[in-house]
Amino acid sequence: MKICDNISEINDDQDLVFIDIEATDSKGEQRIIQFSGYRLNIKKNKIFNFNKKFNPEQEINSRIKTLLNFNKNFNNIEQMPKLDKQAAREIYCFVKNAIVITFTDFDIKKMHELFTYYNFDFEKIVYFDVYKFFEKKLQTKSVPSLFSLGILSGIKINFFKLHNALYDAFILKEIFMCIRHKTNEELYEMYRYYEFLPKIISSSYFVTNEQEKNRGIIKKEIKYVMYIKEFDFSNKFNLDFVVYKKDHHFYSKPIYDSSLELQTISSLTSKSNFMKVKLANIFFNYLSKSAVFSIKKLSIKQSEKFLKFYKTQTNKRKVIKVLNLNLKKEIKPENFVIKAQIICEILFKNPIIHHFVHEYLKIFQNIFSQEEKDN
């Protein structure tokens, strides 16, 4: 096996094979259940695909079944052929005399096991690992996932096809075609954008009662984005925020908007404190599960007023602890905001980003421009 670690050495007249393998998740032997790929010659403008599914003759756990959407993609796996020598030879013929493009070394290891078992010459295989490429170029161990890189490359991801090996190989092919001529600066800009891209799985510190403080930091999966418009309790109770539910990498239409409750509160002469406490509880509930965006700098004074009001009305003390989804650092009440010019510089160029972030960025740009004029 030969490793190609320089993307500039890959020429248009070489055959490239983009592969993805799905396998069982047994504690013992991981067996291949799908081998898929695209073979491409850029200069000749030729491309064809390979897609085979196999009966692993092995128990498949529920996690893998859910991940691979088994009922749809492998509903008749018992009737599928075994991965025998003939099938292995077909795979070998598909990848030989080409540069094999992978994402991580998992696929190349599975091919090594397969070809070694059947005595095929694995030494003739040349491969290029896109994951290692980013790891080396960006000097980071936190390389974006295949699907995050797909989004960053401008691919419109069909989330219903994820973890179908043929579709994953297609995404890999598109990523490679996007990055092959990018400069180091352009690759780094992609990565900087990734820092602000909502993740499928992430954790957050969350609002905790005083009696829970001794338990330390409690982590929870972030399920929502909270976009805070106003957080002002000087002359009125202005807790204006919108909540979006996470849907894969992006966020849905708002599932909650506090403006209606604020209108009700402003129209009430009595029982307004009851409504304020109700709204505060909704705020705390979503805050415990949310990444937070705001165009306002939430001062210590305003935070103290809000928390003091809540304690007076409920006799319950709340402590605000939030880990921002993007910047990966604790946001304290005194700087409870994302405010960085870099967000505008990177994200505003990308049309994929969700509309609520566009709204935020436009407002922030106006604020920043005004600050520059004032200075």
Curated annotation (Swiss-Prot):
Protein name, entry field: Uncharacterized protein UU112
Cystines in this chain: none
SUPFAM superfamilies reported for this sequence: Ribonuclease H-like (SSF53098)
A GO MF term: nucleic acid binding
Source species, domain of life: Bacteria
